[in-house]
């Protein structure tokens, strides 16, 4: 993604507002459907620390349980992402309508603390913001970290790098790209089960006839992956494509991606094929699968990620 300008604004003064609990509107986490918004309330713990209470659903149609009745690690990652957007909007005053651009996203889940058990799970996310660069009194880029707790147990951790763009600056950066992209799949999906999915409508890969390479299958009608008009393919869809490719190369047992290290290099555009390649990495642990996944479009790298985790079945 394009580099941000050099930022030299001083850090503004900010009251801590410690221990004031605030409810969460779904617009603060960039969702339009309540069932896809997971944070419930937040409180500022310090200048750059926030506590967010969230609920992981047990019956979400897209983020369904995986493996041996575990919450999907990508659901946990999405809860992290939403908690970060909430902290920056509500805690730092970044206006709604600004663009939230992740360039890095790493997470580690502890599956022994992610059992579903047939009911929603309440979690607490501590959000840490650091290395903030400021422009006109607002953060323009920075890093964010998460610690996810289920009761007194650490269920996951994560770190990310992010940038923020005003609507005007974003349109200038994007140039002539249409504001609203529409994409309907023209190719058949791969079979759902080997890709780690139960429903064919959630499959985001099409076969190419080449081993370890698929075409990204983009359907802007998907209610969870496309919440509102967008001018590029969302990062959530790219992560899902990576998971599905990893399942396909891992073999019949698939993979539960409890760890991920992801870099987003540029936008994936509508109207041009994006090729997803996956290769199993060598490892000494027979119970863990590690897969490197990359996305390429028009000869450029869109994203790269390394997913690791136990086999989903067996």
From Swiss-Prot:
UniProt keyword Methyltransferase, yes or no: no
Signal sequence coordinates: none
Tagged with keyword Oxidoreductase: no
Assigned keywords, A-Z: Transferase
Pfam families noted in UniProt: AfsA
Catalytically driven reaction(s): a medium-chain 3-oxoacyl-[ACP] + dihydroxyacetone phosphate = a (4-alkanoyl-5-oxo-2,5-dihydrofuran-3-yl)methyl phosphate + holo-[ACP] + H2O
InterPro entries named among the record's database cross-references: AfsA-like, AfsA_hotdog_dom, HotDog_dom_sf
pH dependence: Optimum pH is 6.5-7.5.
Gene Ontology molecular function: any one: transferase activity
Coiled coil: none
Annotated EC: 2.3.1.277
Known partners and oligomeric status: Monomer.
Family as reported in the entry's similarity comment: Belongs to the AfsA family.
Protein known as: 2-oxo-3-(phosphooxy)propyl 3-oxoalkanoate synthase
Organism annotation: Streptomyces griseus subsp. griseus (strain JCM 4626 / CBS 651.72 / NBRC 13350 / KCC S-0626 / ISP 5235)
Gene expressing this chain: afsA
